[in-house]
Amino acid sequence: MQQNEKASLNTSAAAAKAGSYTGYADVYDFWYYHQRGDGLTVNGKPSYTTDKAVSEGLTRPHTTWNGDNVFGKAANLTYSFLNTFSSTPNGHTGPVKFTPVQMQQAKLSLQSWADAANLTFTEVSPNQKANITFANYTRNADGSLNTDTQAYAAYPGTHPVSGSAWFNYNQSSIRNPDTDEYGRHSFTHEIGHALGLSHPAEYNAGEGDISYKNSAAYAEDSRQFSIMSYWEVENTGGDFKGHYSAGPLMDDIAAIQKLYGANMTTRTGDTVYGFNSNTDRDFYTATNSSKALVFSVWDAGGTDTFDFSGYSNNQRINLNEGSFSDVGGLKGNVSIAHGVTIENAIGGSGNDILIGNGADNILQGGAGDDVLYGSTGADTLTGGAGRDIFVYGSGQDSTVSAYDWITDFQTGIDKIDLSAFRNEGQLSFVQDQFTGKGQEVMLQWDAANSTTNLWLHEAGHSSVDFLVRIVGQTAQSDIIV
């Protein structure tokens, strides 16, 4: 949605909510879900935009494998799995070589960072010098078993331990990162450090009384926005039901792209995320309805689709960059990185809300009572079974030169919601022609093609420039005015 249409959402909200129930009210509430920046204070903390979270949070070390304060330059890096070591930088001992399962999961974590930024990773043998090294430890410096720590890593640099990543093999999640999501999450987190990313604020495990309340410098410091954060998603209104991300999230993607540049070769074709995924990435793929998805999308091109058709939960799906969606029974678990356009969305069998963007979207609600809002662009909207509402927020949403199609309208069951136009005056219906006074709606039935044209002449406009084309016949009682 363009900025002036966002303003239209603001000015129309009160008018829409003043009447009977409207789908527009749902769209408005969802549109401002996780609004950030703009001088907001959330949880008693300043709200940061992604750019500010990157500059003042995640990239505070100002270091990359290309040198200090060298940003936006690609890096070709090596990595290895150490056979042994005498002690870690923190004095831990008891080396255990990475298992084949750990190696596989670490490589998947490396791949997720390379998808987002201009990074390549080449494995070398344990006796060769590598930029990033992986090893397990088991004991403290005094020889006692270490059961307290999880993992840690060093930033890039020229020191012998630079880029080293260390993992506590006594932790079940570290031993079994293929079945325990927190293990894979930890691998990706520590690799983030080895690439130059910090925690979003000045805190580390084991250093003082740290918590979201005490330690987070800004509101969005949680595992909903960044895999580099320590803090649970509930602090920022999310609910992952105990699940963890495997790849970098919205703010991480922006941060790693600041350090090494955006990878513009990643998924440039027509990519499907969720069910029927062709991403070849496990965390973007749902194979059944019990699969919990937690991800942020980086996608460099093509005509792309969010397919969440296999879920029966009520879902809220937003295709705008920088947005969050509630998918598969979780809250705020799917996001779209800045600079990404996802064109299409498919809902499931619950009562879903789908919001499009400025592209020519294809939105499919599926079964259930759905609310579809295409926003600007020439959109194709299919409600599916159930009592669906097709929402329009301003005259820009469906113009004479770029009109929407509603493909399966059921008269007497579905609704078209024009309540957002109330802020310009009450709408009225005309039969055969407009009077010129504005705020008039006309339905034009085309019997030969079994379609209806919905025209709207807005107040203050010299000509009629709003048009929606509908497959099937539509009555005045189907329109919310």
Swiss-Prot record:
Keywords from the UniProt entry: Calcium, Hydrolase, Metal-binding, Metalloprotease, Protease, Repeat, Secreted, Zinc, Zymogen
UniProt binding sites for Ca(2+) 3: 348, 350, 352, 365, 367, 370
Binding site for Ca(2+) 7: 384, 386, 388, 414
Sequence positions that bind Ca(2+) 5: 366, 368, 370, 383, 385, 388
Highest taxon in the source lineage: Bacteria
Protein's UniProt keywords contain Nuclease: no
Binding site for Ca(2+) 1: 267, 269, 271, 299, 301, 304
UniProt GO cellular component terms: extracellular matrix; extracellular space
Cofactor: Ca(2+); Zn(2+)
Hemolysin-type calcium-binding repeat coordinates: 346-363, 364-381, 382-399
Family from the record: Belongs to the peptidase M10B family.
Protein name in UniProt: Serralysin B
